[in-house]
């Protein structure tokens, strides 16, 4: 009672001291539910409209057939000749069996889908049965168990059992808790004390200032760093095992601690023995996980380890596509440690990852399984300085140059002898590091650029495992890094990626071709057999048979890849994660900010924007800077003034101050994210010197200028020491950074694409977090920030491409500019109905308070706060309600809208229930899918039988495996997709048992022989024209004029472009087409 009274008194005191304004508190749950229902209804209505249009076309076609039948019937009744009567009867019979029955079946299928869509609209498109932990509608038991981490992607149940041979062991909850505590103690003992040896200088940020907003570290920057390394040979500071003495000391310490001084009768080394107090978990007689690791894994992580072993047994790889924060790194390390513990790790392991997480990989290996030798192949690695005995003098260099081949060294090499000597010394260190790992084991860590630079050395090695972290970097099948990765000599390949399927089948092919070369055939075969039917089935004007064929091909493709892709999300498996609350805190403008804002709204610059004479983004950027801090506008002239960045001129900074002081009293740690270093500079001065009230707060800072070598140390300090706030840029918070020491997050200037901010959120709300996490996005009420944010809420459900596709120029329309470039209208909602709905549920958020929640009444009364609104991420909410089947099919079909256009799985099944064997459409859709799979199998056999591992698969431009030398390349290119569609036509003719010469009357049908011949002739004309041009180049207009093709609609443009792409490449710089080399021969046709 006394504690409760003290808490209440503290709340009253805070309210009295902070209370300025009363504001609206808006419920996140009601806002999400209302908008989600609105947009789902909108999407269903759009799908319903497409289906009704398709139904109308089918009814029109039916009426034509009926009229024709009636006409033939009248002629039959009026004629007297027996031969004519028989001919008319045959025509009527064929018309009824081939055309009328087919259209009637189309109408029946379409009406079934329309009925389902209308039911969803009538019910408000409520997602029933999508509660966490429950099986969802349309989901099989196997899909449910895979999604929740109960079974592997191959359908096998968790098969680990505790190895209790020769010991008494009770498998109960109490014993499990003891195992967990002992394993945790073992992990603590495994930690190194390297951070204690770092000086304060390691944590000082660079004083260099940049004119540009922070940009994500790219490959070119890392490439320059590694190229410099080859000549400078700067010693690294990371405590990896490139220093053999360090590894031996660490190994000796671990052996001593783990054995606990007990007598061991076995002759096996310590890493092969079970823990003296924690039993191993064995899957079979060969594969065991060390007890101290197994005890710390979540159930779904144990399932992943078993799945990786199943892949190992099949001599192939897989993709771990778990959502960010579920411990993909730990699952891989646990598996490799189990291989080592079981005596199955007989070769080296290569880890390829972004430079920012190399040290984290090293730390995690040393933490979870210390006996593994882990070496970083980078300037930060200690191996670059571990052997200074090798020094080349001038005489050695001169002898080497004189005795070498002329092509080995140039005159410049001899002239710049110092640089050449350092390069050779550095190369010696690299060779020695690689040889050490290959000879003695175990782990070599490098970057994607490092793999490319040192490919001459790394591609020669026979690796037991190759792991690509952030493996979607190889999604472009023709990029140099993709081809390099696919040359690695190992069958055991693992990709880690939180976004393995991103609505692009070609990218999906590239990833799978790495983990299982040839599984999906060559890229041209894959595109012909799957991409074309799936894409055609997604068109709004697709016929019923095209819709079903596309869906069945997607299902067939899903069945091919699903065993090798493991994808789980937090909502399904991480039941023990604490609650997360996301809110938008709307701040007020200061008087100075308001005057600056209005000044721009009345400026000539805005007039130019509204008249289309200036880029819209120019004005938006100015207003966003004003919302953050108006001094950013005149940074070049004011940054040296003492009052630059004055916190009193920023409403957001005043809110930040009160939040940090409030959380400091409560003992909470906070992460403060902003998008640019300029704003981060202002915030750092604000906390360190500009405001005396904040001077007692301890903080750290990390941005793009922070040396990669020191980033992990900063993270460890923040998690383990008494810091109040960590200042970070949104991007550098980055991949794999674990900041679970914080349970409060402020995103100072949210990105317009909310998914970008998810990286920042996941730093704290992830496995290992024990407390409730609150995330606050700061926006200025009534400003351009709020206006765009509320537009996003609705548009987010319609399509994700608006924000991610640079070709979408229509996001900002001219007629919207007046509303965007205004101040006020703080409601921000698109409809009054939505506003009333939110107001009605205002109290919901207040009632959701827990012991670790912030007092929302207190927050909205902070000085400078206009209102509090729960953050809405509709995409994430809807994603959590999907089955794994939905996610995979959606990715294959190219997005959610296409999935809804095609139909749900239930709709396909139900619409064909009870249909007879004469259902031509269903049979042909299935046949196309089966033939597509068979084509892949045939292509795969050619790849796997004829080529060794490490031979890149033919992509149509690069690669060797599976490439077919064509005698008639033009002809073969033509028959690819046409063959698929032609088979359906052929089967329809067989089903009617009589050949028919009549085309399908609705004009949207599959390829006929006439169309194929027309396309062949067009292609030959295009090739002949380009053959005569200079450099085989011509513009699109010239090509069309020369061959006399008329384009009547968009479909004609798509067809001609598709034909052009088969024999020519588009040159973006010259804006025209260049004929492929294989068609430049006069005999190519």
Swiss-Prot record:
CDD domains, A to Z: DEXHc_ERCC6, SF2_C_SNF
Domain Helicase ATP-binding intervals: 309-518
GO terms for biological process, alphabetical: DNA damage response; nucleotide-excision repair; regulation of protein complex stability; regulation of transcription by RNA polymerase II; transcription-coupled nucleotide-excision repair
Name this protein carries in UniProt: DNA repair and recombination protein RAD26
Residue ranges of domain Helicase C-terminal in the record: 655-818
Coarse class of the protein's main subcellular location: nucleus
Region named Disordered: 118-141, 190-219
Gene: RAD26
Keywords: ATP-binding, DNA damage, DNA repair, DNA-binding, Helicase, Hydrolase, Nucleotide-binding, Nucleus, Phosphoprotein
Lineage of source species: Eukaryota, Fungi, Dikarya, Ascomycota, Saccharomycotina
SUPFAM superfamilies named in the record: P-loop containing nucleoside triphosphate hydrolases (SSF52540)
Bias (Acidic residues): 210-219
Modified residues (Phosphoserine): 30
Record field: catalytic activity: ATP + H2O = ADP + phosphate + H(+)
Entry's localization field: Nucleus
């Amino acid at each position: 009672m006394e504690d409760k009274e003290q808490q209440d008194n503290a709340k009253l005191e805070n309210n009295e001291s902070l209370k300025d304004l009363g504001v609206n508190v808006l419920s996140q749950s009601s806002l999400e539910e209302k908008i989600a229902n609105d947009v789902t209804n909108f999407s269903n209505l759009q799908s319903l409209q497409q289906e009704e249009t398709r139904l109308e076309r089918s009814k029109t076609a039916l009426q034509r057939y009926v009229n024709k039948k009636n006409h033939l019937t009248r002629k039959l009744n009026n004629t007297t000749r027996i031969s004519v009567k028989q001919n008319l009867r045959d025509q009527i019979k064929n018309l009824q069996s081939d055309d009328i029955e087919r259209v009637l079946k189309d109408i029946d299928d379409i009406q079934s889908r329309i009925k389902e869509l209308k039911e969803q609209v009538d019910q408000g498109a409520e997602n029933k049965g999508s509660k966490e932990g429950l099986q969802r509608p349309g989901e099989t038991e196997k899909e449910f168990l895979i999604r929740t981490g109960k079974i592997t992607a191959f359908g096998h149940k968790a098969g680990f059992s505790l190895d209790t041979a020769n010991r008494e062991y009770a498998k109960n909850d109490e014993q499990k808790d003891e195992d967990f505590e002992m394993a945790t103690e073992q992990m603590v003992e495994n930690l190194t004390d390297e951070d204690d040896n770092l000086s304060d200088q390691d944590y000082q940020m660079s004083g260099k200032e940049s004119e540009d907003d922070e940009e994500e570290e790219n490959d070119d920057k890392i490439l320059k760093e590694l190229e410099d390394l080859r000549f400078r040979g700067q010693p690294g500071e990371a405590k990896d095992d490139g220093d053999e003495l360090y590894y031996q000391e660490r190994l000796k310490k671990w052996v001593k601690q783990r054995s606990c001084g007990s007598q061991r009768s076995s002759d096996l080394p310590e890493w092969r023995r079970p823990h003296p107090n924690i039993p191993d978990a064995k899957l079979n007689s060969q594969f065991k996980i060390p007890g101290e690791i197994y005890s710390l894994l979540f159930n779904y992580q144990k399932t992943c380890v078993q799945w990786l072993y199943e892949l190992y047994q099949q001599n192939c790889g897989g993709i771990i596509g778990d959502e960010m924060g579920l411990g993909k790194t730990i699952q891989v390390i646990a598996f490799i440690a189990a291989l080592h513990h079981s005596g199955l790790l007989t070769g080296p392991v290569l880890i390829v990852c972004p430079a920012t997480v190399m040290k984290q990989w090293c730390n995690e290996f040393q933490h979870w399984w210390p006996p593994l030798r882990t070496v970083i192949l980078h300037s930060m690695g200690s191996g670059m300085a571990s052997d200074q005995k090798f020094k080349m003098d001038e005489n050695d260099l001169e002898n080497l140059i004189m005795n070498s081949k002329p092509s080995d060294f140039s005159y410049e090499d001899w002239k710049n002898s110092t640089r050449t000597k350092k390069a050779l010394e550095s190369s010696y260190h690299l060779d020695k590091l690689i040889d050490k790992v290959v000879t003695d084991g175990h782990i070599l860590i490098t970057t994607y650029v490092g793999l490319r630079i040192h490919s001459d050395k790394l591609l020669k090695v026979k690796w037991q495992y190759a792991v690509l972290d952030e493996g979607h970097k190889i999604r472009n099948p023709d990029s140099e890094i993709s081809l390099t990765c696919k040359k690695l000599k190992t069958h055991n390949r693992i990709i880690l990626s939180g976004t393995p399927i991103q609505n692009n089948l070609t990218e999906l092919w590239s990833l799978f071709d790495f983990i299982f070369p040839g599984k999906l055939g060559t890229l041209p075969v894959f595109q012909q057999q799957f991409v074309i039917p799936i894409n055609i089935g997604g068109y709004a004007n697709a016929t019923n048979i095209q819709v079903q064929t596309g869906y069945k091909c997607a299902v067939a493709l899903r069945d091919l890849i699903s065993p090798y892709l493991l994808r789980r999300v937090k909502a399904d498996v991480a039941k023990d994660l604490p609650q997360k609350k996301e809110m938008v805190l709307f701040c007020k403008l200061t008087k100075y900010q308001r005057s600056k804002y209005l000044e721009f709204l009345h400026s000539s610059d805005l007039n130019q924007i509204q008249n289309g004479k200036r880029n819209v983004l120019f004005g938006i950027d100015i207003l966003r800077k004003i919302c953050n801090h108006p001094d950013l506008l005149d940074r070049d002239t004011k940054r040296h003034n003492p009052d630059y960045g004055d916190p009193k001129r920023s409403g957001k900074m005043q809110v930040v101050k009160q939040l940090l002081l409030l959380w400091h009293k409560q003992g909470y740690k906070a992460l403060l994210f902003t998008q640019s270093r300029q704003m981060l500079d202002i915030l750092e001065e604000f906390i360190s010197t500009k405001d005396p009230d904040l001077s007692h707060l301890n903080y750290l800072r990390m941005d793009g200028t922070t040396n990669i070598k020191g980033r992990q140390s900063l993270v460890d300090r923040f998690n383990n020491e008494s810091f109040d706030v960590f200042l970070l840029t949104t991007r550098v918070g980055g991949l794999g950074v674990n900041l679970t020491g914080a349970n409060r997050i402020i995103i100072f200037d949210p990105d317009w694409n909310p998914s970008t901010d998810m990286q920042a959120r996941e730093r704290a709300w992830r496995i290992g977090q024990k407390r409730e996490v609150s995330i606050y996005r700061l926006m200025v009420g009534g400003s351009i920030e709020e206006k765009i944010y509320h537009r996003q809420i609705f548009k987010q459900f319609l399509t994700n491409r608006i924000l991610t596709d640079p070709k979408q120029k229509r996001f900002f329309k001219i007629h919207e500019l007046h509303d965007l470039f205004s101040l006020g209208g703080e409601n921000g909602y698109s409809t009054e109905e939505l506003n009333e709905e939110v107001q009605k549920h205002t109290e919901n958020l207040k009632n959701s308070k827990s012991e670790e929640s912030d007092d929302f009444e207190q927050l909205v009364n902070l000085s400078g706060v206009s209102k509090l609104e729960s953050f809405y991420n509709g995409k994430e909410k809807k994603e959590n309600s999907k089955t794994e089947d939905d996610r995979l099919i959606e990715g294959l079909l190219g997005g959610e809208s296409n999935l809804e256009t095609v139909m749900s799985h239930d709709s396909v099944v139900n619409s064909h229930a009870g249909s007879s064997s004469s259902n031509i459409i269903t049979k042909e859709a299935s046949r196309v899918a089966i033939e597509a799979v068979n084509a892949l199998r045939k292509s795969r056999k050619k790849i796997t039988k004829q080529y060794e591992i490490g031979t890149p698969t033919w992509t149509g431009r690069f690669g060797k495996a599976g490439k077919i030398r064509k005698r008639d390349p033009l002809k073969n290119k033509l028959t690819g997709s046409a063959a698929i569609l032609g088979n359906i036509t052929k089967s329809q003719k067989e089903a009617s048992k009589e050949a028919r010469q009549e085309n399908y009357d609705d004009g949207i049908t599959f390829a006929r022989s006439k169309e194929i011949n027309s396309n062949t002739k067009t292609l030959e004309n295009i090739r002949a024209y380009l053959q005569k041009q200079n450099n085989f180049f011509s513009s699109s207009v010239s090509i069309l004029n020369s061959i006399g093709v008329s384009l009547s609609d968009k479909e004609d443009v798509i067809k001609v472009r598709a034909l052009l792409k088969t024999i020519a490449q588009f040159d973006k710089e010259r804006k025209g087409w260049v004929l492929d080399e294989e068609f430049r021969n006069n005999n190519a046709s």
